[in-house]
Amino acid sequence: MDDRRISRRDALIQTGGTLVAVAFFQSPLFAWARPGETTIPFVDQPTAPPPPLAGLNQLDWEAQSLDSWITPAEKFFRVGHYGVPEVDAAKWKLQIAGHVARPTSYDLAALKALPKKEVVFTLECSGNHGFPFLPGAIGNARWGGAPLAAVLQKAGRKPAGVEVVFYGADQGEEPIQYIGGLGDKMGEFKARAPFARSMSWAEATDPANLLCYEMNGKPLPAANGAPLRLIAPRWFGISNVKWLTRIEVIDSRFEGPFQAQRYLTVREVPHGDGTTVWTRTAVGKSLLKSVAARVAVVDGNHRIYGAAWGAPIARVEVKVDDGPWKNAVIDKGAEHEFAWKFWHLDWPSPAAGEHKITSRAIDREGNVQPAQDDPFIAGKRTYWEANGQITRTIKLS
């Protein structure tokens, strides 16, 4: 997005500022369709995004006739806050600094000389499904690069180092406010700073994390973070910092604007004594999610298709109307821990009329994707991290 855009956050606020519980997901999964299938459209369709969000390159799978489990780079969603920076790869270096025993820097050739690792990972924007016009900020790619843990461990952590901050080349101005102890506003100024997010040292040295320079076997495109980005497979997109220039180990909690101000999930948590506590947590790790994406029929045989992601998935369950939960068949992705799973459920002899289809994902530890009336979802007051069970409506003739 260019400088004429307003921020995505402001755009969402201007469109109403109210949490939308019902979300939409468009996915025909044509690659696993039966010959001769006809798609039955859902009654509930996503609304058009407001102009500031029209350039996010959302995945509109119905229109694009998806034919691959891997999302092509040109169809991958693009979310940025300060635009795509101009980075000269020939002069670019990654700095490793802060509370490390051996501060150092790497150019791209030095990183490529390290042992290469690949991971198939479904990257999702933390605002995906928070509003009905944001259903496609997600994609699945094969990412390649150097293991982050090896680079950090070679630098060596000093005893005081507890948190790792990842800085991008994209920069912008942010308002800084002074707030008094009684809540009174003391002052404000604007500061220009690079985009940054952080995680703990233990989280940063997760063996799954990559300093990524390849996407789907090709050089990482500029729009997706070239020459180097962080790929952290257990985390929402906001933590997968693009256009990396600096990694700094610090001795305290990082409170940059995209860590402690903007990307916060606010929940109302009732206590047994009738009081309420409001919690504010930074958007962090991916959450369980599954959606019914398409219903198709051939020779009178109906089938529901969908996708699930966000954690190591053990199984997916689907129910129609108030019927029982039934196990879906995983068609693709079971062998990849961090990638979405495409699934289907045969729906024999459905009655004519309107039906509601709901799916839920269950991970390997037995955690179940929550229902919309679960306190974890019902008490949420922000649109980030929307992972309540999604119900789609369809009408059969």
Question: What role is predicted for each listed range?
Answer:
Residues 2, 19-20, 156, 238:
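Short amphipathic alpha-helical segments with coiled-coil-like heptad repeat character
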Residues 1-7:
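N-terminal secretory signal peptides
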Residues 7, 17, 27-29, 64, ...:
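Generic signature of intrinsically disordered, low-complexity, basic-rich segments
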